[in-house]
Design a protein with these regions (language model features):
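Cell-envelope/extracellular polymer assembly enzymes that use nucleotide-activated donors
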Residues: 6-10, 41, 195
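Acidic donor-binding segment of Leloir-type glycosyltransferases
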Residues: 28-69
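C-terminal catalytic/acceptor-binding lobe
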Residues: 20-23, 163-164, 184-251
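Short beta-strand-to-loop acidic/aromatic patch adjacent to the donor-nucleotide binding site
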Residues: 89-100
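Active-site acidic short loop of glycosyltransferases
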Residues: 87-90, 181
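Conserved catalytic core of nucleotide-sugar-dependent glycosyltransferases
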Residues: 102-184
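Glycine-rich, basic loop-to-helix element that forms the pyrophosphate-binding segment
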Residues: 70-86
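N-proximal low-complexity "stem/linker" segments adjacent to membrane-targeting elements
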Residues: 1-30
Length: 251
């Protein structure tokens, strides 16, 4: 960890709406601002029948890959494992395409892993706020900033209660991969966020949370933002139950 100070931010994407692409533009811009504070890279993998996302920033720190994938279901966990293997950093940040976080919170979460205080580290305290369409648009137009959003968070919907585990997290790459990485049995949208935390808990691996909220930009809820069908929903829920019932030795 000491010899490799780079942090890799990895983002799998399937563009299912104009808002999704616009949100990712803003997320990339925000992450690029971290260059002033840490050695970093951003790796984006787009998986779809045809490419729909075009980077707006040309920079040696950003790498984009396109994978042809005609499946209607976006196998996010599979692509995350590929991105983690390709990542150059000893710390990997796994980011959704639509989340914004204050810079200080991201750096706090990185520092917890660097100091050996965590294997998994969240850059927020569990409060996951859904921004309305109007404020999301103001942010993208630069007519509102993160600080102003954070000042009015109590006007926003707290999506998953006060202890969310989705949106963004960082891991010690080698340790996380050693203990399974992402669970590819989750196919499409499902409870993989809860599963990975439960797995860390069973294994006795430390998890850290930075203080402060996460902001989620508006986008339409399309197929890959919800369970694809009843069969997939059942299979994904049963996978979570299976893992949650395991012992450390079984994992």
């Amino acid at each position: 960890m000491q010899s490799n100070r780079k942090v890799s931010f990895v983002i799998p994407v399937r563009v299912d709406s104009p808002e999704r692409a616009q949100n990712l533009d803003l997320v990339v811009e925000q992450l690029m601002a971290l260059k002033e504070s840490i050695r970093m890279e951003i790796r984006i993998l787009e998986a779809d029948e045809h490419p729909h996302y075009e980077l707006k920033i040309s920079d040696e720190h950003i790498h984009k890959t396109f994978v042809r994938d005609a499946s209607p279901v976006f196998h996010r966990t599979k692509y995350l494992n590929r991105l983690m293997q390709e990542a150059e950093g000893a710390i990997v940040g796994i980011w959704d395409t639509d989340v914004l976080l204050p810079k200080e919170q991201i750096l706090e979460a990185v520092d917890a892993i660097r100091k050996g205080n965590a294997v998994m580290s969240f850059p927020y305290d569990g409060r996951f706020y859904m921004l309305p369409q109007e404020d999301s648009l103001l942010l993208k137009k630069r007519e509102m900033n993160m600080e102003e959003c954070c000042q009015k968070i109590y006007e926003y919907v707290l999506a998953h209660g006060p202890n969310s585990v989705g949106g963004a997290f960082l891991v010690n790459k080698n340790v996380y991969i050693k203990y399974g990485g992402e669970n590819q049995h989750f196919y499409g949208w499902g409870p993989e966020d809860a599963e990975r935390c439960k797995r860390m808990e069973i294994l006795g691996l430390p998890i850290y949370r930075a203080q402060g909220p996460l902001l989620h930009l508006f986008h339409p809820r399309m197929q890959n933002s919800w369970f694809g069908n009843q069969r997939l929903e059942y299979a994904n829920r049963m996978e979570f139950i299976r893992v949650a019932g395991m012992t450390r030795a079984q994992l």
